[in-house]
Swiss-Prot record:
One GO process term, biological-process aspect: prostaglandin biosynthetic process
Primary location: endoplasmic reticulum
SUPFAM superfamilies named in the record: Cytochrome P450
Impact reported for R136 to A/K: Loss of thromboxane-A synthase activity. Decreased heme-binding
Catalytic activity: prostaglandin H2 = thromboxane A2; prostaglandin H2 = (12S)-hydroxy-(5Z,8E,10E)-heptadecatrienoate + malonaldehyde; a hydroperoxyeicosatetraenoate = an oxoeicosatetraenoate + H2O; (15S)-hydroperoxy-(5Z,8Z,11Z,13E)-eicosatetraenoate = 15-oxo-(5Z,8Z,11Z,13E)-eicosatetraenoate + H2O
This protein's name: Thromboxane-A synthase
Function: Catalyzes the conversion of prostaglandin H2 (PGH2) to thromboxane A2 (TXA2), a potent inducer of blood vessel constriction and platelet aggregation. Also cleaves PGH2 to 12-hydroxy-heptadecatrienoicacid (12-HHT) and malondialdehyde, which is known to act as a mediator of DNA damage. 12-HHT and malondialdehyde are formed stoichiometrically in the same amounts as TXA2. Additionally, displays dehydratase activity, toward (15S)-hydroperoxy-(5Z,8Z,11Z,13E)-eicosatetraenoate (15(S)-HPETE) producing 15-KETE and 15-HETE.
Species of origin: Homo sapiens
Essential cofactor(s): heme
Length: 533
């Protein structure tokens, strides 16, 4: 009894604290590495993960460089961990086809972090399963050639402001960062086309829309918070969603209120009075269900296999009423995605194309001749003439997107356990398509670091191995806005090159340093000179 009493005394004393501390440390040690055996069990090679954070430090130089390193060290099928989340990285064309097309029903959804802005989460980019299918089907009509043709004048109006600004640099002869000019220009396009709110970023940098756009793209998660989110996602992600965040709430509130005000105004107007912009196209489609099936959603396939802008017969059907019309939040979400793609991706694509033309004057001269001939025939270009009348510009843009794909990685989630070409994929796994590594694989693209638009002649395209060129993804969940994005890039370069010639100068960084926190872009801008023609 005395012994038991002694034991009881000790158990109730400091040893309890010590025992609990040891148990907690042991639990933390186990937790810190418990998620890091899954890739090995799948037979996939990967960098050695660090406790809690996985391979976060592997990506400190940026996702673009690290993607290339992963492909080089571990092959076309490998993996990594960000915190406790496992990623399976694929740069093998046949397997990509299986994931994006053949087994699409099991890989319908994109990965979501749970931290997306409310407006982004309600966009077609992140909607899931049946609701994604309904909204995507409704929005398909907003990107028809007929609807896009109505947006050409709005893009051209914003381009006029860009040309006036560039003229000052041509007159001064000074080197300048043309990426900053494209940033202002794409802000104007997004405001006008997606939010129904014309702005002039050049003359009114303090405009509320301009300021909130800059705040949105400057928004980032502090590194210590990121480490906590990755290390303890089941606790930290729900906590981050409910905790007050003034910056996030102000941005959400501004864009939401802006769209709601425009919708209220449009609903009061007669149809002929309404501005014909992207927002109106979405509003027109909000009650209409598409008669198409998921198999008809692959708009990228249509764009790259079409002969001009002839309508697709499978899409010539009358829509039926939608069982659950698009909500205001979902309409705001589509405008928000236009903001992300229209600002960052279009800006970077224009910047890369300008850099490549400035540093490859022979290609630029060939393009200038095509532009001049086109302008003689089409002083006010329309969508169809842009689609069919500028083959070399198409080749230049295609090669730009091969070398510098802004969306150089995208994901799909496995809904159920499955096997893809002999590789076991567990339910919930995140599959990452390594577009950058694929586009720079010499097996598919000889001399991949060389700018060569001739890779994309009509004859050369026929020789490309399928699923080795994915700047807009592939399959039913490929980029819905591909036509609009290409239209904006083509129309901009057409107008700019009709007036100016790009010149490399001592300030031009060759080769460009790249930044890849999200989309791929120039790290230090694109400094060139321009000369009036």
């Amino acid at each position: 009894m005395e012994a038991l009493g002694f034991l009881k005394l000790e158990v109730n004393g400091p040893m309890v604290t010590v025992a609990l501390s040891v148990a907690l440390l042991a639990l933390l040690k186990w937790y810190s590495t418990s998620a890091f055996s899954r890739l090995e069990k799948l037979g996939l090679r990967h960098p050695k993960p660090s406790p809690f954070i996985g391979n976060l430090t592997f990506f400190r130089q940026g996702f673009w460089e690290s993607q290339m390193e992963l492909r080089k060290l571990y092959g076309p099928l490998c993996g990594y961990y960000l915190g406790r989340r496992m990623f399976i990285v694929i740069s093998e064309p046949d397997m990509i086809k299986q994931v994006l097309v053949e087994n699409f029903s099991n890989f319908t959804n994109r990965m979501a972090s749970g931290l997306e802005f409310k407006s982004v989460a309600d966009s077609v980019l992140f909607l899931r399963d049946k609701r994604w299918e309904e909204v995507r089907g409704a929005l398909m009509s907003a990107f028809s050639p007929e609807k896009l043709n109505e947006m050409v004048p709005l893009i051209s109006q914003a381009c006029d402001l860009l040309l006036a600004h560039l003229k000052r640099y041509a007159e001064s002869g000074d080197a300048f960062d043309i990426q900053r000019c494209y940033c202002n220009y794409t802000t104007d396009v997004v405001a006008s086309v997606a939010f129904g709110t014309p702005v002039d970023s050049w003359q009114a940098p303090e405009d509320p829309f301009v300021k909130h756009c800059k705040r949105f793209f400057e928004f980032c998660i502090p590194r210590p918070i990121l480490v906590l989110l990755l290390s303890f996602p089941s606790i930290m992600v729900p906590l981050a969603r409910i905790l007050p965040n003034k910056n996030r709430d102000e941005l959400n509130g501004f864009f939401n209120k802006l769209i709601r005000n425009v919708i209220a105004l449009r609903d009061q107007q007669a149809a002929e009075e309404r501005r014909r912009d992207f927002l109106q196209m979405v509003l027109d489609a909000r009650h209409s269900a598409s008669p198409m099936g998921v198999q008809d959603f692959d708009i990228v396939r249509d764009v790259f296999s079409s002969t001009g802008c002839k309508p697709n017969p499978s899409r010539q059907h009358q829509p039926s009423p939608m069982a659950r019309p698009l909500t205001v939040d979902e309409i705001v979400g589509q405008a928000f995605i236009f903001l992300i793609a229209g600002y960052e991706i279009i800006t970077n694509t224009l910047s890369f194309a300008t850099y490549l033309l400035a540093t490859n004057p022979d290609c630029q001269e060939k393009l200038l001749r095509e532009v001049d001939v086109f302008k003689e025939k089409h002083m006010a270009p329309e969508f169809c003439s842009l689609e069919e009348g500028l083959p070399y510009l198409d080749m230049v843009i295609a090669e730009t997107l091969r070398m510098y794909p802004p969306a150089f990685r995208f994901t799909r989630e496995a809904a159920q356990d499955c096997e893809v070409l002999g590789q076991r994929i567990p339910a919930g796994a995140v599959l990452e398509m390594a577009v950058g590594a694929l586009h720079h694989d010499p097996e598919h693209w000889p001399s991949p670091e060389t700018f060569n638009p001739e890779r994309f002649t009509a004859e050369a395209r026929q020789q490309h191995r399928p699923f080795t060129y994915l700047p807009f993804g592939a399959g039913p969940r490929s980029c819905l806005g591909v036509r609009l994005g290409l239209l904006e890039v083509k129309l901009t370069l057409l107008h700019v090159l009709h007036k100016f010639r790009f010149q490399a100068c001592p300030e031009t960084q060759v080769p460009l340093q790249l930044e890849s926190k999200s989309a791929l872009g120039p790290k230090n801008g694109v400094y060139i000179k321009i000369v009036s023609r």
